[in-house]
From Swiss-Prot:
Names of the cofactor(s): Mg(2+)
Protein name, per record: Multiphosphoryl transfer protein
Source organism (scientific name): Rhodobacter capsulatus (Rhodopseudomonas capsulata)
CDD domains xref list: PTS-HPr_like, PTS_IIA_fru
Domain writeup: The PTS EIIA type-2 domain is phosphorylated by phospho-HPr on a histidyl residue. Then, it transfers the phosphoryl group to the PTS EIIB type-2 domain.
Signal peptide limits: none
EC numbers, comma separated: 2.7.3.9
GO molecular function terms attached to this record: kinase activity; metal ion binding; phosphoenolpyruvate-protein phosphotransferase activity
GO cellular component: cytoplasm
UniProt KW keywords: Cytoplasm, Kinase, Magnesium, Metal-binding, Phosphoprotein, Phosphotransferase system, Sugar transport, Transferase, Transport
């Protein structure tokens, strides 16, 4: 307890402003020999980054932790201001309690102050008394209330024990973190420190505990999500409760890039926040630029139908060639998967019904521009209104392709500059593939869209270009005017409007830390992912072509966990032959130089179409002829691919994987065909596995495991099939989270079935490359994580700094959660 005498209490003072009030308190402390006068500057420095107004007319100015060497002797000084002084907008301080504490001796003073915060009459008495002894007695605890104390609430039945580790106890900042966390759960939470019990959702109540370093707290909870709440709180205490005075200046996000869930970050930012979905991690500070497409105007009518028809044909042909050039450019810079969308756009331009309908309108006296605009707009509107999310999502592609033709049929009327010419954060309702292909990463520091989700085209491009991005922010995003300064936190899915200097400093610190972290990860990328307690997790890469095979090795991948062979079949007029496929597989094996590769057989259907294969139009393509079903119904393609794979297997460690297995019969048929092909080419046996991405496969996993060498869990499809949510859906994308407990329980069942059959389990998909997901999956027993190439080094580093025992405990607690948000709150 800090001794307080009347000499350090100034009664009946006035102050012109907050700085004057603090200066008077500093004078008292300096005159008493308690501090160096420069500590006053530290107190003002604290005010620049935090509000020290407690409430009920009481403020507690104190210095920054790095300036404690300016404190000679721990002390407090009180300046009474009966007339008050504005401390912050809307807050008037009448009792200024200046604290100069070397450690946690001041906690009892804070505890006594919290009693006053809940008693307006007592606060008024202290702000107007003419006797300094009254204030001294109240702050030192000598004037305890006379009334009999109320009965202390009992602990709830379910609880945990934690210890306060912070050097300065449970002071305001860590207590605020704890309150914010507790409020995220419906359960009632109580925290006991000896005889005192606090409401875990009340800052005042928590401060009243007076919990110093080393205090043993009993935390109990009651309610439907009590187990999850206690698990999250235990993890928060273990992590230090975001106490900057003990953990240093680095922002929490710098340690875990890629986390979605904006709650923790929002609580830390002072500026107004807009919340969306994390699309690409990282930070950006820049003015916004509102993306606007050029407007094309055209005449409604035209007299010469033949001339207008020729204009339409020429515009269609010109647009087709533009798309061809754009396809080739994107292929070179971003790979075939990114370029494939432009082939689809070319198909729109060849649609015979659209062209015929437009020409019919021209024959009725309409201009080519009017006719084409009417036709593609009507069809886009029809697509956008469809209930099927895949089809409705095509509307933006059709409008993009249609607009490309239209610009050759009318006059371009430019409003805003089409693309930015200075560094900015680009805002848009959504971006088409054509838009994103033209972005200059040197100027676009960040991306934010009102629509979309983490698997939208914009998000995929942002990650490929390493641009921080937030999607699905909503219409209010577009209320921001060009030039508005913002901070974009891609990992948290947050945009901070007009960030304060403290927000900017925090982001700049985090950016510097993130850069340093990535540089360290890059230097250590070839180290194995061996946990601190000796468990090995292999981190491999998802690839689509030879260039990515080379890049995966350079990135530190320990092999390829998923080769998407679809890229061999797209952007061409006929399927590749056996020798062509063999040459490509052999080139990949050469690039991997002995590292293993899992080759997934052709996986088309659903949202992956190949025009020349004449795939049937299905009402529900995701529930139709997908994956292995397509291969079994096109056995000639399947056998050709298997022959190429088996022939290539002589040159390296090849494993074969069948996609979208739903039933035992599918697997047995696929294995029979594969064995027939192997014997035909005279190849040695290779490991054969299946993807677990359909709930029926999970339920049949014990039987399936007896028939394969490994499982690979496709978390993206498993999530959408388990939750009945298309991960591309503009509304449901936010909820289609692979860390939902329902999905995790399916994964847990799969792993246990595999372990019983003594086969290994890998995972690919979004959560394998997510920091929380990697920890949970490894804790569940997944032994191989296949991630995007840019994520390899970071996931390996994270696993090297973790303990498998802790990951198993995290996984156990995650399985007990009821929502994805609870799971993400565990770590």
């Amino acid at each position: 307890m800090i001794p307080l005498t009347s000499e350090l209490v100034a009664i009946g003072k006035t102050a012109t402003d907050k700085a004057d009030a603090i200066a008077q308190a500093v004078d008292l402390l300096t005159a008493a020999g308690k501090i160096d006068p420069r500590y006053g500057q530290s107190m003002m420095g604290r005010e620049a980054v935090a509000n020290t107004f407690l409430g009920n007319g009481i403020a507690i100015p104190h210095g920054l932790p790095q300036d404690r060497d300016l404190i000679h002797d721990t002390a407090i000084a009180v300046v009474q201001l009966p007339a008050g002084v504005e401390w912050a907008p809307g807050d008037t301080a009448r009792l200024v309690v200046a604290i100069a504490a070397k450690s946690d001796e001041h906690l009892q003073v804070l505890s006594n102050l919290t009693d006053v915060l809940g008693d307006e009459a007592e606060a008024e008495r202290l702000a107007t008394t003419l006797d300094a002894a009254v204030i001294v007695a109240r702050l030192t605890g000598a004037a305890a209330p006379v009334a009999a104390p109320a009965e202390t609430p009992a602990d709830f039945a379910q609880g945990i024990d934690v210890v306060v580790t912070g050097a300065h106890g449970l002071h305001a900042r860590p207590a605020t973190t704890l309150v914010d966390l507790a409020k995220g759960f419906a359960a009632e939470i109580r925290i006991r420190n000896g005889a005192k019990v606090a409401n875990g959702k009340s800052l005042i109540s928590l401060l009243n505990l007076g919990a110093a370093q080393g205090a043993a707290l009993r935390i109990s909870a009651e309610g439907a999500d009590a187990t999850a709440a206690l698990a999250a709180i235990a993890a928060a205490f273990e992590a230090g409760l975001e106490d900057e005075e003990d953990t240093g200046a680095a922002a929490p996000e710098a340690a875990t890039p890629g986390l979605t869930g904006a709650g923790a970050s929002m609580a830390s930012y002072e500026g107004r926040t807009l919340v969306g979905i994390s699309s690409s991690p990282g930070y950006a500070l820049a003015p916004v630029f509102r993306f606007a497409r050029d407007e094309v105007v055209f005449d409604t009518d035209a007299a010469d139908a033949a001339f207008e028809t020729d204009r339409l044909d020429t515009a269609l042909q010109t647009a087709w060639h533009e798309l061809e050039e754009l396809h080739d450019e994107v292929w070179k810079t971003s790979g075939p998967a990114r370029a494939a969308i432009f082939r689809a756009h070319q198909e729109f331009l060849h649609d015979p019904e659209m062209v015929a309908e437009a020409k019919a309108l021209i024959g009725q006296g309409r201009s080519a521009g009017f006719a084409w605009h009417r036709v593609f707009s009507d069809r886009a509107d029809m697509l956008g209104a469809m209930k099927d999310a895949v089809l409705s999502g095509r509307a933006i592609d059709l409008r993009d392709a249609g607009q490309r033709v239209l610009q050759h049929l009318g006059r371009v009327r430019t409003g805003e500059t089409h693309l930015p010419t200075a560094p900015c954060i680009l805002l848009a309702d959504d971006l088409t593939p054509s838009d994103t292909a033209r972005l200059d990463p040197a100027l676009v520091r960040g991306l934010a869209t009102a629509q979309g989700g983490p698997t939208s085209h914009t998000s995929i491009i942002a990650r490929a270009l390493d641009i921080p991005a937030v999607a699905g922010v909503g219409p209010r995003l577009l209320d921001l005017a060009t030039g508005t300064p913002v901070l974009l936190d891609g990992g948290a899915g947050v945009i901070v409007v007009a960030p304060t200097e403290a927000d900017k400093a925090r982001a700049e610190t985090a950016m510097a830390a993130l850069t340093a972290q990535r540089e360290l990860e890059a230097r250590e990328r070839y180290k194995p992912a061996l946990t601190v307690d000796g468990a090995r997790v292999e981190v491999v890469a998802n690839i689509s072509d030879v260039a990515e095979a080379i890049a995966s090795v350079e990135a530190g991948a320990e092999g390829v966990g998923l080769l998407r062979t679809e890229f061999l079949f797209v952007n061409r007029e006929a399927p590749p032959g056996e020798d062509e496929q063999l040459a490509i597989y052999a080139a990949m094996l050469s690039a991997l130089n002995g590292l293993p590769i899992i080759i997934r057989t052709l996986d088309v259907g659903g949202d992956k179409e190949i025009p020349y294969l004449r795939m049937p139009v299905e009402q529900n393509p995701f529930l139709g002829e997908r994956g292995i079903r397509f291969c079994l119904s096109h056995e000639d393609l399947f056998r050709t691919q298997l022959r190429a794979i088996y022939r290539a297997s002589a040159g390296g460690q090849v494993r074969i994987m069948f996609p979208m297995i739903a039933m035992i019969e599918e697997l047995e048929t696929a294995r029979r065909i594969a064995e027939e092909v192997r014997l035909e080419v005279g190849a040695a046996p290779v490991e054969i596995g299946i993807m677990i991405e359909i709930p029926s496969a999970v339920m049949m996993a014990p039987e399936l495991a007896k028939r394969v060498d490994f499982f690979s869990i496709g978390t993206n499809d498993l999530t959408q099939y388990a939750l009945a949510m298309d991960r591309m859906h503009p509304v449901l994308a936010k909820q289609a989270d692979g860390l939902h407990p329902a999905v995790l329980r399916l994964i847990d069942s799969t792993v246990r079935a595999a372990e019983a059959a003594r086969i290994w389990v890998g995972a690919c998909g979004g959560i394998a490359g997510d920091p929380v997901g990697a920890a949970v999956l490894s804790g569940l027993g997944v032994r191989e994580l296949s991630v995007s190439i840019p994520a390899v080094a970071g996931i390996k580093a994270q696993l090297r700094h973790s303990a498998m025992a802790e990951n198993r405990d995290l996984a156990r607690r995650a399985l007990a959660c009821t929502t994805a948000a609870e799971v993400r709150g565990l770590k």
